[in-house]
Regions:
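Gram-negative (and chloroplast) outer-membrane scaffold detector with strong preference
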Residues: 40-127, 135-141, 173-185
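Transmembrane beta-strand segments of Gram-negative outer membrane beta-barrel proteins
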Residues: 7-24, 98-102, 172-175
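Internal, hydrophobic beta-strand segments that form the core of beta-sheet-rich folds
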Residues: 146-149
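Solvent-exposed loop/turn segments connecting transmembrane beta-strands
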Residues: 23-34, 92
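Outer-membrane beta-barrel biogenesis signature
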Residues: 1-19, 87, 91-95, 183-185
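Alpha-helical scaffolds that organize eukaryotic protein assemblies
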Residues: 144, 156, 168-174
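Primarily recognizes Gram-negative and organellar outer-membrane beta-barrels
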Residues: 6-10, 58-65, 115-117, 156-168
Length: 185
């Protein structure tokens, strides 16, 4: 059962959670989509304090001709250490919680143009913001719907040229939908 805190909030008494989401992110020049799989460990289940490790793979659906050759694709392979504080709310007997998080991501990316040129690079640090709802579907299963913002505040490209690794300095906004499964108690 969810554990009650001194603030009257609720949290699942599950130390481990596995997640899989489908992500839609875009900025002025690039629209991306892809999947994220994650593992979260709750240090304090009562207050929703946990650390999360995720792997994210995105590919662009379109690119602007102003910043990239037509047909450019952007593949992002990410390993994302993530720390997050979760806030839980109980409503009308249907358990869900609101969550907000701040994390630092380190990822590698490769860009392949329509003429076969490729470049690779490393971008860090990246700040990831998330705010969403997790609805309880069954005892340990949750449906996650989240708004996401990813900001690349410093890019270094070790490959093809010295342009920013991602268009518009790598700032993306969008949303995710997926499932999370709790393990443990």
């Amino acid at each position: 059962k969810p554990a009650e805190t001194r603030f009257g909030l609720k949290a699942p008494a599950l130390p481990h959670m596995l997640g899989a989401t489908y992500d839609f992110l875009s900025n002025t020049y690039v629209h991306t989509h892809g999947a994220t799989v994650s593992y979260a460990y709750f240090f304090d289940g009562r207050n929703g304090i946990h650390a999360e490790l995720a792997y994210r793979s995105l590919e662009s659906a379109s690119a602007s001709e102003r910043r990239a050759d037509p047909g450019t694709s952007v593949d992002i392979f990410a390993v994302i250490p993530h720390y997050e504080r979760r806030f839980y709310i109980q409503r009308m007997g249907s358990f869900y919680f609101v969550r907000g998080g701040l994390g630092v991501n380190v990822y590698t990316a490769s860009i392949l143009t329509d003429v076969g040129k490729s470049r690779e690079g490393l971008a860090a640090p990246v700040v990831s913001l998330a705010l969403g709802l997790d609805f309880r579907v069954s005892r340990n299963l949750y449906l996650e719907v989240a708004a996401r913002y990813i900001g690349d505040f410093a890019s270094w490209n070790f490959g093809y040229d010295s342009e920013p690794l991602l268009a518009n300095e790598g700032f993306f906004g969008g949303f995710s939908v997926g499932l999370r499964f709790g393990l443990g108690r």
